[in-house]
Amino acid sequence: MSGGNLQHLYFNKIRVELQKQFEYTNVHQIPKLTKITLNRGLGTLYQQSPKVFESSVSDLMLITGQKPRFNKSKKSIAGFKLREGTVVGLSVTLRRKKMYAFLEKLIHFSLPAARDFRGLSTKNFDGLGNYNLGIKEHAIFPEIDFDKIDHSYGLNICIVTTANNDIEGKALLKFLGMPFKD
């Protein structure tokens, strides 16, 4: 999937609709997607089982199409048995075509495949038009073979926009096809 359909839809139809709805005088005021970040905290899995760590890296690579960045601890904390420099999470930042391809896959395939999915909450906006979404199982993505999963884990997905407030951000994501409850 190229993501061209959603990107084409945004540039040809959604921008015009948003400009009419919010009465923007300048095309640069129209909200757009900036990036999508995926984060996965590893906790103590990295220390306990290297196999789970390697599968987490490969699964995130399959889901996004690019290699994840390793987030390392900044200081040692004895209570958590954590040393400075230990990998504590993985993150991927998607932009441009990969961002639109991932969003299209998320909206049309992954979210409807989630168990008991009834729509996304509109309370997950941060006040600046950015949307945060937590996924409990990474197996909802079509690239992941459910039979080969050793350990199921969740992801945090942050959709960053140039919107000034939640109303503009919600309108943008709704036009893009995000399945909100309301």
UniProtKB/Swiss-Prot annotation:
Its main location: plastid. It is found in: Plastid, Chloroplast. SUPFAM superfamilies: RL5-like (SSF55282). Keywords: Chloroplast, Plastid, Ribonucleoprotein, Ribosomal protein, RNA-binding, rRNA-binding. GO terms for molecular function: rRNA binding; structural constituent of ribosome. This is Large ribosomal subunit protein uL5c. Part of the 50S ribosomal subunit; contacts the 5S rRNA. HAMAP family: Ribosomal_uL5_B. Pfam families: Ribosomal_L5, Ribosomal_L5_C. GO terms for cellular component: chloroplast; ribonucleoprotein complex; ribosome. Signal peptide: none annotated. GO terms for biological process: translation. Gene3D superfamilies: 3.30.1440.10. Binds 5S rRNA, forms part of the central protuberance of the 50S subunit. InterPro entries: Ribosomal_uL5 (IPR002132), Ribosomal_uL5_bac-type (IPR020930), Ribosomal_uL5_C (IPR031309), Ribosomal_uL5_dom_sf (IPR022803), Ribosomal_uL5_N (IPR031310). Transmembrane segments: none annotated. The gene is rpl5. Belongs to the universal ribosomal protein uL5 family.
